[in-house]
Curated annotation (Swiss-Prot):
EC main group: lyase
Subunit structure: Monomer.
UniProt gene name: acnA
Catalysed conversion reaction: citrate = D-threo-isocitrate; (2S,3R)-3-hydroxybutane-1,2,3-tricarboxylate = 2-methyl-cis-aconitate + H2O
Cofactor(s) required for function per UniProt: [4Fe-4S] cluster
Family matches, as Pfam families: Aconitase, Aconitase_C
InterPro entries assigned: AcnA_IRP_Swivel, Acnase/IPM_dHydase_lsu_aba_1/3, Acoase/IPM_deHydtase_lsu_aba, Aconitase/3IPM_dehydase_swvl, Aconitase/IRP2, Aconitase_4Fe-4S_BS, Aconitase_4Fe-4S_dom, AconitaseA/IPMdHydase_ssu_swvl
Organism, scientific name: Staphylococcus epidermidis (strain ATCC 12228 / FDA PCI 1200)
Pathway the protein contributes to: Carbohydrate metabolism; tricarboxylic acid cycle; isocitrate from oxaloacetate: step 2/2; Organic acid metabolism; propanoate degradation
Cystine residue pairs: none
Protein name listed in UniProt: Aconitate hydratase A
Source species, domain of life: Bacteria
Family note: Belongs to the aconitase/IPM isomerase family.
Record GO biological process: propionate metabolic process, methylcitrate cycle; tricarboxylic acid cycle
Length: 901
C-alpha cells in the first residue's frame, strides 16, 4: 500500500496534448524532508526511484526519509534499488541465463509455477565478448573471425537464442553488432522512460544495472547505472532490489577545457589516477562545474566508462543540453527528446551550469587545461605516465622490483633480442620494449568519434609521409558499433588505417578482455624462447597482468591516436615527443607532431560525417541484423533441455538438495588456508576469462570430454559450465599464491601431505575430507571486472570465508550472494602483522546473532599448537545480505520466496 508521502508526490504534466504522471521530488522539500537543490543529481535519481516504488513492504517511508537526509547524520541507512532495466553481455550473461533456466527447472521439479521465473523488467543481452582476433591486417578479417566465432560458440548462441523465445522481457543483440555499453549509449538508453503503471502513462528516469563493470559508461548521458555480478542482476530481473548503504558522493569540479594534443582518453586516465589516490571505492562520483560544458558527450562517456578503474560505483554526468544534443545526433525521436527535457526540468534533475552547485560529501578540483598526453601501465590503469616520461618510465619498470610497476629484471634485459624468420622469408629483430600488439579496441574509446577519427587522421598523415608498421606488430581495429565503420568509411579514413594494418577485425571487446588471439607462431616461439619482455599498446580500459596475452608482460593503455603512433614506432622504449617515429619516403625524420591532427581538424571531420542518418540506418533492425544468428535452429519449449554431455551448458549444482527453509548460521571450524595473496588480487586473477591451458585442471577436463585443444575456446566462453569454471578458479597464469613458493599460477600446498598441487585438486581433496577452506588477502581484493564466477567458483571450491584487508565493491557483494562470508581485518592488521603464514587451522565464531559490521572472534591454530586470536569485521553491509548468507545465497532465497508466494 502506498504511503501518504508517495500519494502527495504524485503529480501530472502535459506535453503535446498528452498527460504524464510523475513523482515530484519537490514534495519532499515541502514536507521538510529534503532540500532538493542541495542534493547531488545522482542522489535525486535514487530518491525518485524509492519515492515512486515505495510499497510499504520492500521499500518504505523510512527509506525515503533516510535518503532525503543525504549529507546529514553521516548518510545512515541503506537504499533498496530497483532499476528500470538490466543489460547483459554474453560472458556474464550466459551464466545468468543458465541460472534462470536452472531456477525454472528447480521450480518445475518441486511442482511450482515456472512462469514465476521470468524477467520482471526489460533485459537486453548484447553478444560482444566472444569474438577473437584470429585474422587481422587483411580485408577478410571480419568475415573470417565471425565465422570462427560462430563455429566456436554455436551451442552458447543456440542457448541465448532459445532464451529470447522462452522468457518474457528478454532480447538479444546478435554477434557482430557492437559492444554492449556502446549499443546501450547509442541506442538502448531512453534517458527517461514512459511506462503504463496502473493505467497511467508514468514518466521516470532510466536506470539500470549490468553484468559488466563498465556498465558505468551510461552515466555519461545521465542514466544512473553500474555493474553488478550476474547473480545480483538475476535477482534484479526477478524483481528483487539491490541494497547498498547510502553512498558518499564525491563532486569533481571541472574547469577550463582540454588543450591541443590532449584527448578524452588522456583525461580519463588522469581522472583514474586522481580518484584512485583519493579513494572512492563504494562511492558515487559526480562531475560538475563550468568545464563540463566543454566536454562533448562522447568524452563524458569515456570518463564514465572508467569508473571501475578509479574504484567508484559510478561517475555521473547529469543530463543537460549536451545530452539532448547527443540524443538528437544518435537518431532518437524528437518528441521523446522534448519529453526528456520537460520531465527532468519539472522534477529538478536537469543540469544547468548557472544553477547553484549541489552539496557533495567532498569536492576535487580538476583543471582540464592541465591534462597532458598520457598512457597508463604497465600493469594497472591507475598508473599514469605522461607521454613525455614514457621512455624513462618504461626503462625504469624493467629493473624495478617485481610488482605493480616493475618486472624485477636486471640490466641485461636491454641486451636481449629475438630473431624472427617469417614464413614469407622476411626477417625481423625484436628487442625489449618492442610492441607485439597494437589494438584500437574497447567501448571506452571506440564510442568516441573524436578519438576514432583522430586515429584515422594520424593514419592518413602517416601513410602520406610513407611510414609503415613493423611486421612483428599485431594490429587490429574492433569498434563498439557499426556506426564507427560508417563514419570511418564516409570520411575516407578507413583506407589509411587499412594501409597500416588496422583493418576491421570484428565488433566486440577483443583485445581489451584478452581475446587478442594468437601472435604469429614464429613470433610466439621467438618471444618465449628468449623470454623477451614485449609490450602491447591498446585503447582499452584494463591492463592487468596476464589479461591481454600470456606472452605480453607489459601493457599500456592509450588513446587510439597514440596506439597508431606507437604501432608505427614499433616500441614503447622511445621518447615520442623528441625522437623520430621513423623515416618518411623522402628520407627525412618524421616526428609525432608531423602526423598529429589539430583539435579543429578532428572537430570538422566529426561534424561532417557523424550524422543521425548513420545511427538510424545501423540500428533499424538491430535484433535481427545477423543472418547466421537468424538461422540458428531453436526450440520454443519453456524448459531448457540440459545435455549432460555438453561442455558449454550444464545445469549448475546450486539448487541440489535445497531445503524448504534455510538453516541457522553456525560457527566455521578448522578451516584450512587454500590461498594467501597480497594486494590488488583482481577478479581476472580469481576467474580468468582468457585461454585455457591443456595442462590445467580445466584443460584436462575438456580433453577427457573429447574436446580438441584447438576447440578449447576461452574460460569466458565456457561460463555456462560450472565444471570448467570451478577448475578455472584461481587459475590465472600470473596469480601468485604465497602458499606455493616458487610457482606462478593456480597452485597451493595441500597441508595434510605438504604437496604442491593445482588449487582445484587440493580443494577436491579437502572436500572429500569435509574440510572447509579460507582465503587470506591484502587490500583491494576482487578489484576489476564484475565477474560473478569469481564468487561462484570460490563457493564451489569449498571456500567458506575470505579474510582480506579491504574489498572492491562488486566482488564483496558477490561473495555474500554466493553464501561466502567476507571478513575484513581491523585497521592496521593483516595476515602478516598477525603472524599468519597460511599453515594454520582457522575457526570463525559466527552465529545466528551476527549483525552487519559486527566484530567476530577468529582463532588461528598453528602447527605447533600456538593459538593466535584476533577479531575481524563481518562485511555484511545490509540486513538483507545477512538473509542472503543465511539462505546460502541470493538465488536460493529467491527460489524459496517464489515457492512461498
Amino acid at each position: 500500500m502506498a504511503s501518504n508521502i508517495k500519494e502527495q508526490a504524485k503529480k501530472q504534466f502535459e506535453l503535446n496534448g498528452q498527460s504524464y504522471t510523475y513523482y515530484d521530488l519537490q514534495t519532499l522539500e515541502e514536507k521538510g524532508l529534503a532540500k532538493i537543490s542541495k542534493l547531488p543529481y545522482s542522489i535525486r535519481v535514487l530518491l525518485e526511484s524509492v519515492l515512486r516504488q515505495e510499497d510499504d513492504f520492500v521499500i518504505t517511508d523510512d527509506h525515503i526519509k533516510a535518503l532525503s537526509k543525504f549529507g546529514n547524520a553521516g548518510n545512515e541507512g541503506e537504499v533498496p534499488f530497483k532499476p528500470s532495466r538490466v543489460i547483459l553481455q554474453d560472458f556474464t550473461g550466459v551464466p545468468a541465463v543458465v541460472d534462470l533456466a536452472s531456477l525454472r527447472k528447480a521450480m518445475n521439479d518441486v511442482g511450482g509455477d515456472i512462469n514465476k521465473i521470468n524477467p520482471e523488467v526489460p533485459v537486453d543481452l548484447v553478444i560482444d565478448h566472444s569474438v577473437q582476433v584470429d585474422s587481422y591486417a587483411n580485408p577478410e578479417a571480419l568475415e573470417r573471425n565471425m565465422k570462427l566465432e560462430f563455429e566456436r560458440n554455436y551451442e552458447r548462441y543456440q542457448f541465448l537464442n532459445w532464451a529470447t523465445k522462452a522468457f518474457d522481457n528478454y532480447n538479444a543483440v546478435p554477434p557482430a553488432t557492437g559492444i554492449v555499453h556502446q549499443v546501450n549509449l547509442e541506442y538502448l538508453a531512453n534517458v527517461v522512460h514512459v511506462r503504463d503503471v496502473d493505467g497511467e502513462k508514468t514518466a521516470f528516469p532510466d536506470t539500470l544495472v549490468g553484468t559488466d563493470s563498465h556498465t558505468t559508461m551510461i552515466n555519461g548521458i545521465g542514466v544512473l547505472g553500474w555493474g553488478v555480478g550476474g547473480i545480483e542482476a538475476e535477482a534484479g530481473m526477478l524483481g528483487q532490489p539491490s541494497y547498498f548503504p547510502i553512498p558518499e558522493v564525491i563532486g569533481v569540479r571541472l574547469t577550463h577545457s582540454l588543450p591541443q594534443g590532449s584527448t578524452a582518453t588522456d583525461l580519463a586516465l588522469r581522472v583514474t589516477e586522481e580518484l584512485r589516490k583519493k579513494g572512492v571505492v563504494g562511492k558515487f562520483v559526480e562531475f560538475f562545474g563550468p568545464g563540463v560544458q566543454h566536454l562533448p558527450l562522447a568524452d563524458r562517456a569515456t570518463i564514465a566508462n572508467m569508473a571501475p578503474e578509479y574504484g567508484a560505483t559510478c561517475g555521473f554526468f547529469p543530463v543537460d543540453e549536451e545530452s539532448l544534443k547527443y540524443m538528437k545526433l544518435t537518431g532518437r525521436d524528437e518528441e521523446h527528446i522534448e519529453l526528456v527535457k520537460e520531465y527532468l526540468q519539472q522534477n529538478h534533475m536537469f543540469f544547468d551550469v548557472e544553477k547553484e552547485d549541489p552539496e557533495y560529501t567532498d569536492v576535487i578540483d580538476l583543471d582540464l587545461s592541465t591534462v597532458e598526453a598520457s598512457l597508463s601501465g604497465p600493469k594497472r590503469p591507475q598508473d599514469l605516465i605522461f607521454l613525455s616520461d614514457m621512455k624513462k618510465e618504461f626503462e625504469k619498470s624493467v629493473t624495478a622490483p617485481a610488482g605493480n610497476q616493475g618486472h624485477g629484471l636486471d640490466q641485461s634485459e636491454f641486451d636481449k633480442k629475438a630473431e624472427i624468420n617469417f614464413n614469407d622469408g622476411s626477417k625481423a629483430t625484436m628487442k625489449t620494449g618492442d610492441i607485439a600488439i597494437a589494438a584500437i579496441t574497447s567501448c571506452t574509446n571506440t564510442s568516441n568519434p573524436y578519438v576514432m577519427l583522430g586515429a584515422g587522421l594520424v593514419a592518413k598523415k602517416a601513410v602520406e609521409k610513407g611510414l609503415k608498421v613493423p611486421e612483428f606488430v599485431k594490429t587490429s581495429l574492433a569498434p563498439g558499433s557499426k556506426v564507427v565503420t560508417g563514419y570511418l568509411r564516409d570520411s575516407g579514413l578507413q583506407q589509411y588505417l587499412d594501409d597500416l594494418g588496422f583493418n576491421l577485425v570484428g565488433y566486440g571487446c577483443t583485445t581489451c578482455i584478452g581475446n587478442s588471439g594468437p601472435l604469429l607462431p614464429e613470433i610466439e616461439k621467438a618471444v618465449a624462447d628468449e623470454d623477451l619482455l614485449v609490450t602491447s599498446v591498446l585503447s582499452g580500459n584494463r591492463n592487468f597482468e596476464g589479461r591481454i596475452h600470456p606472452l605480453v608482460k607489459a601493457n599500456y593503455l592509450a588513446s587510439p591516436q597514440l596506439v597508431v603512433a606507437y604501432a608505427l614506432a614499433g616500441t614503447v622504449d622511445i621518447d615520442l615527443q623528441n625522437e623520430p617515429i621513423g623515416k618518411g619516403k623522402d628520407g627525412k625524420d618524421v616526428y609525432l607532431q608531423d602526423i598529429w591532427p589539430s583539435i579543429q581538424e578532428v572537430s570538422d571531420t566529426v561534424d561532417k560525417v557523424v550524422t543521425p542518418e548513420l545511427f538510424l540506418e545501423e540500428y533499424k533492425n538491430v535484433y535481427h541484423n545477423n543472418e547466421m544468428w537468424n538461422e540458428i535452429d531453436v526450440t520454443d519449449e519453456p524448459l531448457y533441455d540440459f545435455d549432460p554431455n555438453s561442455t558449454y551448458i550444464q545445469n549448475p549444482t546450486f539448487f541440489q538438495g535445497l531445503s524448504k527453509e534455510p538453516g541457522k548460521i553456525e560457527p566455521l571450524k578448522s578451516l584450512r588456508v587454500m590461498g594467501k595473496f597480497g594486494d590488488s588480487v583482481t577478479t581476472d586473477h580469481i576467474s580468468p576469462a582468457g585461454a585455457i591451458g591443456k595442462d590445467t585442471p580445466a584443460g584436462k577436463y575438456l580433453l577427457d570430454h573429447d574436446v580438441a585443444i584447438r576447440n578449447f575456446n576461452s574460460y569466458g566462453s565456457r561460463r555456462g559450465n560450472h565444471e570448467v569454471m570451478v577448475r578455472g578458479t584461481f587459475a590465472n597464469i600470473r596469480i601468485k599464491n604465497q602458499l606455493a613458493p616458487g610457482t606462478e599460477g593456480g597452485f597451493t600446498t595441500y597441508w595434510p601431505t605438504g604437496e604442491i598441487m593445482p588449487i582445484y585438486d587440493a580443494a577436491m581433496k579437502y572436500k572429500e575430507d569435509g574440510t572447509g577452506l579460507v582465503v587470506l588477502a591484502g587490500n583491494d581484493y576482487g578489484m576489476g571486472s564484475s565477474r560473478d564466477w569469481a564468487a561462484k567458483g570460490t563457493n564451489l571450491l569449498g571456500v567458506k570465508t575470505v579474510i582480506a584487508q579491504s574489498y572492491e565493491r562488486i566482488h564483496r557483494s558477490n561473495l555474500v550472494m554466493m553464501g561466502v562470508l567476507p571478513l575484513q581485518f581491523q585497521q592496521g592488521e593483516s595476515a602478516e602483522a598477525l603472524g599468519l603464514d597460511g599453515k594454520e587451522e582457522i575457526s570463525v565464531d559466527i552465529n545466528e546473532d551476527v549483525q552487519p559490521h559486527d566484530l567476530v572472534n577468529v582463532t588461528a591454530k598453528k602447527e605447533n599448537g600456538e593459538i593466535i586470536n584476533f577479531k575481524a569485521i563481518v562485511r555484511f553491509d545490509s540486513l538483507v545480505e545477512l538473509d542472503y548468507y543465511r539462505h546460502g545465497g541470493i538465488l536460493q532465497m529467491v527460489l524459496r520466496n517464489k515457492l512461498a508466494q
